[in-house]
Amino acid sequence: MPKTVVGVLRGGPSSEYEVSLKTGASVLKHLPEKYTPHDIFISRDGIWHSHGLPRDPDRILRKVDVVFNALHGAYGEDGKVQKLLEQFGVPYTGSQSIASALGMNKALSKKAFETYNLKTPRSVLVRKDNAGDKDLVEIFQTFPHPYVVKPVSAGSSVGVSVV
């Protein structure tokens, strides 16, 4: 019986590129012997590679049975690569594209949690194009110190500031 071919997606056009490479390398190293590993590297500029050569995603994905998604941040956790895998009919690890997109956006996630009466921290969505100094002063006066500031759609702790 042939072994299941597991494509391990790593790298990608994200600020979390380096950690994705490490995650993917660890998965490739520790994949049980009953599986055949297939390293799928995505460069910072979004070019997919297999066996060290640039390839179209569809050509690569035809050679795997399942994908282990080791991508982090944008493209890997925001529903984009999940949508692509769904379009090609390739099973993969992690949440489906809609859940991934929702989970990556903190404001949308908060609304979804509140719909189900789940407690969430008090917050305010500030957009750089519509928040003047006066608005920011008013916002900061209504919240206790310290303030935790985070981009609405960045992964992990990327962009987090405690002020």
Walk through the language-model features, giving the residues of each.
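ATP-binding N-terminal substructure of ATP-dependent carboxylate-amine bond-forming enzymes
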Residues: 1-98, 102-108, 115, 127-138
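Glycine-rich phosphate-binding loop of ATP-grasp-fold ATP-dependent ligases
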Residues: 20, 121-125, 146-163
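A short, polar/charged loop/turn motif at coil->beta-strand junctions and beta-hairpin connectors
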Residues: 62, 120, 142-143
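Short glycine/serine/threonine/alanine-rich loop segments
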Residues: 90, 118, 145
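Basic phosphate/pyrophosphate-binding loop/patch that engages nucleotide-derived ligands
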Residues: 112-120
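Acidic/histidine-enriched active-site and ligand-binding environments that engage anionic O-linkages
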Residues: 136-149
